[in-house]
């Protein structure tokens, strides 16, 4: 990873809503991560398994032994230099999209955060509850503050679920996908090499297509913020990197 370019990546994500950085993890680091993943007990309730997708929510909490492997020197530099000194983890999900997956995701923004309880709070809502976990749409400034790192454990292109994004859509607030004007907007595919990362703002419109090349796609999705929620509410997955 070229650390000289971090400033360029920072300006790219601010302007366009995403950036791709390759060579963030070495072959040895990837092997160590894969070893942990191979030995996971997949029967837990936070794990969702189907023919098309295997998902682990609250991934860093469920698989704590992987944290030090994920937060290598390069990732810590990215968080500090691009996001900011005080950013901490607020959500983590592992996505394993198998070789024959028909799973696809329509264009959307990531509009919810994970919190520790449900309560009436001005400008927070709507609420959803999944597996005793509370998610809520917070005020816009909270969403605008978040950065996402997607760590790619496999080479990823448009044929096995690379994210497609609408550049600069993160600057337009809540942007309903059904209102996308394709005469104005354009689509960009974010190819990422194995061991590389994609950085994204949650308000960037993004989606992915079905797998067509028979190659799997495994991604660690980690969100960061440096905002403290109103004192009655806590980030349920808060973790300092």
Description of each model-found segment:
Residues 5-8, 13-16, 25-194, 207, ...:
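Non-heme Fe(II) oxygenase catalytic core, chiefly the N-lobe of the double-stranded beta-helix
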Residues 17, 202:
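Glycine-centered, phosphate/nucleic-acid-interacting loop/turn motifs that mediate DNA/RNA or nucleotide
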Residues 239-240:
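Glycine- and charge-enriched low-complexity intrinsically disordered segments
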């Amino acid at each position: 990873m070229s650390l000289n370019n971090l400033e360029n990546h920072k300006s790219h994500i601010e302007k366009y809503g995403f950036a791709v950085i390759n060579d963030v993890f070495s072959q040895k680091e990837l092997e160590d991560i894969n070893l942990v993943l191979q030995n996971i007990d997949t029967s837990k309730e936070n794990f969702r398994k189907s023919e098309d997708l295997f998902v682990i929510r609250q991934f860093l909490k469920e698989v704590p032994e992987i944290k030090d492997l994920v937060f290598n020197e390069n990732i810590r530099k990215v968080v500090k230099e691009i996001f900011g000194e005080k950013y901490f983890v607020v959500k983590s999900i592992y996505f394993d999209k198998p070789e024959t997956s028909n799973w696809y995701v329509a264009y959307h923004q990531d509009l919810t955060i994970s919190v520790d309880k449900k309560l009436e709070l001005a400008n927070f809502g709507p609420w959803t509850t999944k597996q005793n976990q509370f998610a809520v749409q917070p005020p816009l400034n909270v969403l605008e503050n978040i950065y996402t790192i997607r760590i790619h454990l496999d080479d990823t292109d448009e044929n096995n679920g690379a994210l497609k994004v609408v550049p600069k859509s993160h600057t337009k607030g809540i942007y309903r996908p059904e209102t996308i004007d394709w005469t104005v907007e354009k689509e960009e595919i974010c190819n990422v090499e194995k061991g590389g990362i994609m950085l994204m703002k949650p308000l960037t419109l993004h989606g992915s297509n079905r797998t067509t090349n028979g190659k799997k796609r495994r991604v660690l999705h980690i969100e960061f913020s440096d905002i403290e929620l109103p004192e009655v509410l806590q980030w349920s997955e808060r973790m300092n990197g």
